[in-house]
């Protein structure tokens, strides 16, 4: 052992499992991984880490190398990269101090190049041309900055984009005020040559990279691979390659101190420089996305579950090992540990994505609670942590609700069909019923039709028989921006009717009231009735005669409806009424069942799968603009007319006819 070094004592404490920590699916708390400086400098702690790499197979070693490479490339901030660089430099410094042969294929040695470039990239978020100018004008012509780029260039050769040449027409960077020497081997420079703290940080990483490169058998220094060297002439000890003793100048924990020194010593009046320094030292609190395009797979749910389940602690602040599929017992830690940043008096958040600057609420708001509010308006469905982007399965609740009647009506759409229970009375849910069915009353609608109430969400239709419902979170756009206007101003002004039963609503629809009627509201088909009466020619003529009679009975009202196409008479036939039953007085139940056979014809035509447009008849005696025949396209969703017709049911008594 060389003079001037402290004696090494055996380490008897717990040794971390490198395979578990690098491959398990959870974010370990840094407070549990901190090793005191006395342990690193005075014991052989690193020897136990090195021994674990020596006992791994080739496949296991490749898995650990890939896991660490992905962790470096996906590091969220400068501090995370600096901690990785600190760990790597401490590891190789202890290897040199303990005189242990280097394994050039372990995860630390195999990821040196990626770590060096990642460190430079994170530092370069700040305006390094201004921070390293040393009074040079313009700041972009900083010679120290050009020297830093050459150190981090990889193979030590001169890069054309880093200096102006006489042959080039466009120079990406201005020429430096001082001549920057070319770097064939970084170990040829004295450590005092690197004046700026950022240069010293990159120098440590680049020196280790050159040493590992030669240990692997590369003839030329750097990343240029040459022929293999005779194993007898190749050594695996760092002391045989570090002639300048740069690694001996490294002190455990000095990387963070050098970066702090570089930022604290700089002072300027450039607003862009201050802004870039702020972002370079910050930890991202979000994904940097303004909107998320729709995807055909579950990538949105998987990404949201990744951030909210793996990166967020529990509500009490302690780390929850149950979030990890591979985490073991005894690895949890209390929330009393805090990780400090290089800046004085500033505490890093307990996890990478905490939000301590959110001023929308009084106090600190976690990342998991930013998009899902805990208020009564946006209350979660259960005590489990539900992602705000997860769409709840509303069909599950509708499917489990008891049907009031065994009679069912079948709806046929474009290539899909669904069933819905039909009740003889569709009165609104009372207070007790609303409490029993919070899924329909609290967060969505006041009826069983699945229509979303205003202000709580919006309905996107259905997919595979299951309606899609997206609950509105505090950061989403209000539904008034996306959802169309439910009712027109004319319908609001003319809605003065009280809530009626389905029977009276169907009767009033035949008497010229302000109600709609469509094919989907027709009674179900009874197979016991005579089907031979329906033919294409006779049915079409009967529909035309009935339409003429209805038009003649309403001659007192000025006609304002547009002309109908040829298929209009067949489509405008109402299943519940005839020309003789269109009186303005209150209609009775007889008006609904007087023409059962004619209704069956219309129902049979609908059930044959004809996808012709649905004609909805709108009649209003008080408003001429509403008295017209509006043509609407076929509703291919599974919700049928019960969703589109009863969305305003319960407000001023205006609702569509539903059975």
Curated annotation (Swiss-Prot):
**Source species of the chain:** Elephantid herpesvirus 1 (isolate Asian elephant/Berlin/Kiba/1998)
Q: Which terms are listed as keywords in the entry?
A: Host cytoplasm, Host nucleus, Metal-binding, Transcription, Transcription regulation, Virion, Virion tegument, Zinc, Zinc-finger
Query: What Pfam families does its record include?
Result: Herpes_UL69
Locations of Low complexity compositional bias? 324-336, 413-427, 553-575
Region spans: Disordered: 317-659
Keyword Signal in the entry? The reply is no
Give me the stretches of Acidic residues compositional bias: 617-628, 646-659
Where, per UniProt, does this protein localize? Virion tegument; Virion; Host nucleus; Host cytoplasm
The residue ranges flagged as biased composition, category Polar residues, are 354-365, 503-513
Name the record gives this protein: mRNA export factor ICP27 homolog
In residue numbers, the zinc fingers (CHC2-type) are 130-273
Q: Which family does it belong to?
A: Belongs to the HHV-1 ICP27 protein family.
Q: Which GO terms describe its biological process?
A: regulation of DNA-templated transcription
Q: Please give the GO cellular component terms listed in this UniProt entry.
A: host cell cytoplasm; host cell nucleus; viral tegument
Which regions are flagged for Basic and acidic residues bias? 387-397, 483-499, 598-610
Question: According to its UniProt entry, what is the function of this protein?
Answer: Immediate early (EI) protein that plays many roles during productive infection including regulation of viral gene expression and nuclear export of intronless viral RNAs.
Indicate where this protein is primarily found.
virion
InterPro entries, from UniProt? ICP27-like
Identify the residues that bind Zn(2+): 130, 266, 268, 273
Q: Name one GO molecular function term.
A: zinc ion binding
